[in-house]
Structures are given as C-alpha cells and as structure tokens.
C-alpha cells in the first residue's frame, strides 16, 4: 500500500479498510471499476451512497495543497459504474487561479479515462461556485447528483439555479461529448504524437484553441492534460494543470519532470503558453516546448 493512504485507512470502518487495502498498490491512481466497487460494497455491508462518502478520505489523500494545507477529495461516478477520484492541487508561489479544485480533478480523471456521462459527484463539502459552474458544463450537467455528508442527494440544479451554461452560447456538444478535431504535424516523436491526439480531443468551443500538454518523467512515463473550457470562462481547466493533476494522482513528484510539451491550434483566438509556462516553472526546472499546429 502507498504510504500516502496510511492516515486515510485509519478513518475507514474496519471491513472497508481491509477490503480496499489490496487496491491501494503502487499503481493505484484513484480509479475503482464497477466490479471492484461491488466487492467493496459487499465486504463493507454498506449501501452504495454510504460507501461512496466513506471513500472520500482516500480521494483526499491525493491532494497537494501547499498553500491552504486543506485536503479536499472528490469522486466522480460515471455511467459505466466506475468511480474516479480527484483532489485539490495548489502551485507553490503562484496565484490562486492556478489551483485545481477537487471536483475538476475528478471530472478530468473521468474524461481522460473515456467516460461520456458523469451521473454523480461525491464531495466532503458543498461545491464552491467555481465547481458548480464547471460541473454545469458537462453533458446533462444540471442533472448530475451531488452527494454531501449528512445531506439529501440533490441535482446540480438545486445548487446552481437559473444557471448560465453552454446552451446559452449555442453549444450543443458540451464537455464529455467526444471531440474530434484534426490537428496535423509531421512528427515521429511519440510524445508529440500523444499530445496531438489529446489536443484533438480537447474541449474549446469558445476560443477554438484546441490544446493539450504532455509531461514526461525521467523514467519515460508520460502524463497528459487537455484544455477544458467553460461557458463562464474563468472556471476553464488549463491543460498544464490537468497534466499536473494526473501526475499527482499517480503519486509522481513534479521534480521528476524532464520534458514538457504544449500543443495548441493556430486558429485559436487565445494562447495558453504564458499560463502553462508559469504553472510549469513553479514546480519544475524544465523548458516548455510550445508547438502551434494547423487544424484541418
């Protein structure tokens, strides 16, 4: 079991703790599939909703909050029945808008894993306005069920009435809808090819700046992030932050980064290079490779 989960395990009921320990091996990064979840439910003798709330301390152990020192965990449950954990990330010395909220982390985890619908968000405190707006960008976002300790399960619309969202800007394919943007570049570099693939899957209906980041560690492992825009603009999730969140979930230290690539579309009305460089340089001493590509 990874050391980062030791304190969290102590907070779980003993039957659940015993059942989940085998999952928390060196490769665990916050994903529990539907079959594993069923095993945990049987072992713990908990109702599903009770179990999901009980697992929040495990999600919170994924957090890296050097500024607030406040660990927040969130879980996104997909239509597949799988659950995806996420946690808050803060970048040392950088402005607070560089932070990743736990709900963003969990949702991006589900998105990168191929989920097309998120049905439930489980979190240990009421989602902030920023996160409510981010959830609202999803397919059927207003219907996503919000689970909070000691509170009735309510749809997002309960927490965000009279919402402004993608439909108000005539967007008919919101976040989690499969994106297919063709970006071409003649390269045989596996890392650049990976970044191109993820940029083509990014969500940028408002600026058309389809973009992604791929980070490589010294052992050759890669961690990706896609740009995820929001109708309210500010809650948009930057690809660098998503990639760093992915690294954190996999228990990698940011000092292990030895290469970083940002790919973005030449047709976008903005550029993410400045924000990406600021975020990267707060955690690693490595130059950002910035590649602008033509969309087909």
UniProtKB/Swiss-Prot annotation:
Binding site for substrate: 88-90
Note accompanying the cofactor annotation: Binds 1 zinc ion.
UniProt-listed InterPro entries: APOBEC/CMP_deaminase_Zn-bd, CMP_dCMP_dom, Cyd/dCyd_deaminase_Zn-bd, Cyt/Deoxycyt_deaminase, Cytidine_deaminase-like, Cytidine_deaminase_bacteria
EC number: 3.5.4.5
Family annotation (Gene3D superfamilies): Cytidine Deaminase, domain 2
Binding positions for Zn(2+) per the UniProt entry: 101, 128, 131
Pfam families linked: dCMP_cyt_deam_1, dCMP_cyt_deam_2
Domain CMP/dCMP-type deaminase: 47-167, 186-296
Catalysed reaction, written as an equation: cytidine + H2O + H(+) = uridine + NH4(+); 2'-deoxycytidine + H2O + H(+) = 2'-deoxyuridine + NH4(+)
UniProt function note: This enzyme scavenges exogenous and endogenous cytidine and 2'-deoxycytidine for UMP synthesis.
Assembly: Homodimer.
Family: Belongs to the cytidine and deoxycytidylate deaminase family.
Matching PANTHER family: CYTIDINE DEAMINASE (PTHR11644:SF2)
Protein name: Cytidine deaminase
Gene that encodes it: cdd
């Amino acid at each position: 079991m990874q050391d980062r989960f030791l304190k969290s395990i102590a907070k779980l009921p003993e039957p659940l703790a015993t059942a989940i320990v085998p999952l928390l091996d060196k490769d665990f990064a916050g994903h529990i599939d539907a079959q594993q979840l069923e095993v945990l439910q049987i072992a713990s003798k908990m109702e599903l909703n009770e179990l999901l709330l009980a697992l929040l301390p495990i999600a919170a152990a994924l957090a890296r909050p050097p500024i607030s020192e406040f660990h927040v965990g969130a879980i996104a449950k997909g239509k597949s029945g799988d659950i995806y954990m996420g946690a808050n990330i803060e970048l040392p010395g950088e402005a607070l808008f560089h932070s990743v909220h736990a709900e963003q982390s969990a949702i991006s985890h589900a998105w990168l894993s191929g989920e097309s619908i998120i049905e439930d968000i489980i979190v240990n405190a009421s989602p902030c306005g920023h996160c409510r707006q981010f959830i609202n960008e999803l397919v059927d976002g207003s219907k996503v069920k919000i689970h909070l300790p000691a509170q009735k399960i309510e749809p997002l619309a309960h927490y965000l009435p009279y919402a402004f969202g993608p439909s108000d800007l005539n967007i008919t394919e919101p976040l989690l809808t499969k994106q297919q943007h063709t970006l071409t570049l003649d390269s045989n570099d596996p890392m650049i090819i990976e970044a191109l693939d993820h940029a083509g899957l990014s969500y940028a209906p408002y600026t058309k700046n389809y973009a992604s980041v791929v980070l490589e560690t010294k052992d050759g492992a890669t961690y990706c992030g896609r740009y995820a825009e929001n109708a309210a603009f500010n809650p948009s999730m930057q690809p660098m932050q998503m990639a760093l969140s992915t690294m954190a979930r996999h228990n990698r230290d940011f000092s292990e980064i030895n290469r970083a690539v940002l790919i973005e579309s030449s047709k976008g009305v903005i550029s993410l290079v400045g924000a990406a460089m600021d975020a990267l340089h707060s955690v690693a001493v490595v130059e950002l490779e910035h590649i602008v590509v033509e969309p087909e």
